[in-house]
Amino acid sequence: MTTATPSPANPLTGRTVVVTGVSRRAGIGHAIACRAADLGASLLCHHFSPHDAEQPWGADSVEATLDSVRAHLVPGARLVDVEADFRDPAAPPAVIDEAVRALGGVDALVCNQASSGRDGGLEQIDAADLDHH
């Protein structure tokens, strides 16, 4: 975290936002990260492109996705990215630890990641399926 003073145009200046699921330019995570950057935030963008590669829409270029987010950063804001598979119980705390190490802390967390494509109907979903998300 920085000591920069937020302005009405950039109310997230000096804040760090972690956004999970920033792996493709057509995704919600990308849109959220771009908007947070527009508002002055420094960002840790999490992605896991192997998941998208398994989907019918396919994977996007992670670097192109991150470059697109970088284009929204205001002067002084920074972007850090981490690839992590949240099926590994050690991954979520490691992502937060990296935000603290690289950006000084976490002011907001947007949990956008999800597992797609294997749920079936609502009547078939059980607790294990929900935990997988």
Language-model region placement:
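Canonical Rossmann dinucleotide-binding motif of NAD(H)/NADP(H)-dependent dehydrogenases/reductases
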Residues: 4-50
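Conserved catalytic-site loops of classical short-chain dehydrogenases/reductases
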Residues: 16, 107-108, 131
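Glycine-rich phosphate-binding loop and adjoining beta1-alpha1-beta2 segment
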Residues: 47-68
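The beta1-alpha1 cofactor-binding region of Rossmann-like NAD(H)/NADP(H)-dependent oxidoreductases
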Residues: 60, 82-95, 127
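A short helix-to-beta-strand connector/capping loop
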Residues: 67-80
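Glycine-rich phosphate-binding loop signature in dinucleotide/nucleotide-binding domains
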Residues: 99-104
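Conserved NAD(P)H cofactor-binding loop of Rossmann-fold oxidoreductase domains
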Residues: 112-118
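Substrate-binding pocket helix/loop in short-chain dehydrogenase/reductase
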Residues: 120-122, 126-133
